[in-house]
Amino acid sequence: MVDILPHPSFLGDMGDHSKKKSGIAMCVGCGSQIHDQYILRVSPDLEWHAACLKCAECSQYLDETCTCFVRDGKTYCKRDYVRLFGIKCAKCNIGFCSSDLVMRARDNVYHMECFRCSVCSRHLLPGDEFSLRDEELLCRADHGLLMERASAGSPISPGNIHSSRPLHIPEPVPVRQPPHRNHVHKQSEKTTRVRTVLNEKQLHTLRTCYNANPRPDALMKEQLVEMTGLSPRVIRVWFQNKRCKDKKKSILMKQLQQQQHNDKTNLQGLTGTPLVAGSPIRHDTTVQGNPVEVQTYQPPWKALSEFALQSDLDQPAFQQLVSFSESGSLGNSSGSDVTSLSSQLPDTPNSMVPSPVET
């Protein structure tokens, strides 16, 4: 908090109490004693000259007309404080406006347009699965490709995925084929097979049987033929493919677990954490730090002047009293004059004692 206080020497007897309380005022900026009429006090106990309290970056003077922040013993205006210490986008390193919608991934904050996969630049929408690896965002497909390369023993980093992606697929170029004999041409031709498409009911029946017994006997296969209406060859091939897929998946999971165990043992594990993108939220512009609150105090002679204008006082005697208060000569040497003047003044009610006015 910054308080604008009149210097005790300008208050005369009225300033004795604050003088005893504050002691000698030393400026934090220049280190010299403050003799000015006003002291800028920064909460809790930092005191400045009015000419010394300014922004450490842009040298803008800080007073009751602006907000300032204190960090590491330095004072900043609001604009420079937000620029230097405010929250910035983890992708473009640019700050946020109060109207910006942001996406959060752990401790990182992103603009809506910056929330993209670092490999394929696909925009990640709410509900999409992604991972955060080396402070870079990866979509689910690129994260899976990265894990496959890790299981194969290749160096894993998001930048290595670019090399495994086809950059351009060339158009087929027609090539003139030399004439072949008829029997050779017939042997090179492959017979076209019809692809069997299973419906949900057939798949559910086959999966239920597979979970109970991955290797059904001949009797079970005959029952499946009657229940699904598929040929024995299709059922046999489906079970073979299913066992092969499960075996590959089991081997891959073991390799991934072994790789993760080795990474943790060697303190080199950088496994991406799978996350799910949430809905964008409005950025909170509240900056960390205590904003400066400014208070101004009205000089006592000004309060007396306003009181005199609203009451029936002897104007010549009162003007003489005000001149003594302004010049700071209302001390022990002029005590007799003050006594004679104060006898001419009416009693001042307690409600008219000047008090600080907050602005």
Swiss-Prot record:
Biased composition (Polar residues): 337-359
Region Disordered, residue ranges: 171-190, 326-359
Keyword vocabulary terms for this entry: Developmental protein, DNA-binding, Homeobox, LIM domain, Metal-binding, Nucleus, Repeat, Zinc
Molecular-function annotations in GO: cis-regulatory region sequence-specific DNA binding; DNA-binding transcription factor activity, RNA polymerase II-specific; metal ion binding
Cellular localisation: Nucleus
InterPro entries: HD, Homeobox_CS, Homeodomain-like_sf, ISL1/2-like, ISL1/2-like_LIM1, Znf_LIM
Pfam families: Homeodomain, LIM
One GO CC annotation: nucleus
Biased composition (Low complexity): 326-336
Residue ranges constituting the LIM zinc-binding domain according to the UniProt record: 27-80, 30-143
Coiled coil: none
DNA-binding region: 191-250
Gene Ontology BP terms: angioblast cell migration; axon extension; axon guidance; axonogenesis; exocrine pancreas development; neuron fate specification; positive regulation of transcription by RNA polymerase II; venous blood vessel morphogenesis
Superkingdom: Eukaryota
PANTHER family tied to this protein: INSULIN GENE ENHANCER PROTEIN (PTHR24204), INSULIN GENE ENHANCER PROTEIN ISL-2 (PTHR24204:SF2)
Function: Binds to one of the cis-acting domain of the insulin gene enhancer. May be involved in subtype specialization of primary motoneurons.
Descriptive protein name: Insulin gene enhancer protein isl-2a
Record organism: Danio rerio (Zebrafish)
Encoding gene per record: isl2a
